[in-house]
Swiss-Prot record:
Keyword terms, alphabetized: Cell membrane, Lipid biosynthesis, Lipid metabolism, Membrane, Nucleotidyltransferase, Phospholipid biosynthesis, Phospholipid metabolism, Transferase, Transmembrane, Transmembrane helix
Pathways involved: Phospholipid metabolism; CDP-diacylglycerol biosynthesis; CDP-diacylglycerol from sn-glycerol 3-phosphate: step 3/3
Membrane topology: Multi-pass membrane protein
Gene Ontology CC: plasma membrane
EC number(s) on file: 2.7.7.41
Subcellular location: Cell membrane
Family: Belongs to the CDS family.
Protein name listed in UniProt: Phosphatidate cytidylyltransferase
Gene Ontology biological process terms, A to Z: CDP-diacylglycerol biosynthetic process
Xref: PANTHER family: PHOSPHATIDATE CYTIDYLYLTRANSFERASE
Transmembrane segments: 31-51, 65-85, 93-113, 131-151, 165-185, 206-226
Catalytic activity: a 1,2-diacyl-sn-glycero-3-phosphate + CTP + H(+) = a CDP-1,2-diacyl-sn-glycerol + diphosphate
Main subcellular location of this protein, as a coarse class: membrane
The encoding gene: cdsA
Length: 228
């Protein structure tokens, strides 16, 4: 028998998933429009994201100057790298792919974990994450990247992103790093005893909760674009 409390918890989880999906669609749509057609808007969005992440980081780590200063290193760097890459017209489609990858792994890892359960990935840091969710999220991100690249007139100049096999492999690697980045920030949230960094994005929490994956993935993504 399921208790009333458990029913309420399940209903809340279901509502949270719907909110997460809806707000995710809105965010993705906004960023796709900005990346493809309004470069200046993308710059503004990324600066606002960076400021939002820094604000939430400062609120979270205000009791420790050492941890507070870490945020002024790990947040501006990925934001700056993504803005720099976007200045090149040839990178706009690849950047769109990048956001599709890091956001799809997060969404499908959550759906996969809640649907199929399984062994906990890092119970002390992020109790809801599972190995099953990680695998489903990673593979889904790779497949979505390939599917998006099949859109007619969708031409990518970078060979490693235009080749479907390489794209799938790179996408899976970025997806795994995105989940590692998520756990990295979750470690600090646990350390300072907070669940969400904020509540500005429905279903996601704060800006840091939604964009934490760029902290580790953006430098890798930048390296791939520059050196491959």
């Amino acid at each position: 028998m399921i208790t009333q409390k458990e029913k309420e918890h399940l209903a809340k989880d279901k509502q949270n998933i719907y909110l997460r999906i809806i707000s995710g669609i809105v965010l993705v749509s906004l960023f796709v429009v900005a990346i493809l057609w309004f470069k200046t808007l993308f710059y503004i969005l990324m600066i606002l994201v960076g400021l939002g992440m820094l604000s939430e980081w400062c609120n979270m780590t205000s009791s420790s100057i050492h941890y507070l200063l870490i945020g002024f290193i790990i947040i501006p760097i990925p934001i700056s790298l993504l803005i720099f890459l976007s200045t090149q017209e040839s990178n706009r489609l690849v950047i769109m792919l990048y956001f599709c990858i890091i956001w799809s792994v997060d969404t499908f890892a959550m759906i996969g974990g809640k649907t199929f359960k399984g062994t906990k990935l890092a119970p002390k840091i992020s109790p809801k994450k599972t190995w099953t969710g990680l695998i489903i999220g990673t593979i889904s991100a790779g497949l979505i990247a390939v599917l998006v690249s099949l859109i007619p007139y969708y031409h990518i100049e970078n060979y490693y992103f235009s080749n479907k096999i390489y794209l799938f492999i790179i996408s899976c690697i970025l997806a795994l790093i995105a989940q590692s980045s998520d756990l990295f920030i979750s470690y600090f949230k646990r350390k300072f005893n907070i669940k969400d960094s904020g509540h500005i994005i429905p279903g996601h929490g704060g800006v840091l909760d939604r964009f934490d994956s760029i902290i580790l993935t953006a430098p890798v993504f930048f390296g791939i674009n520059i050196y491959l």
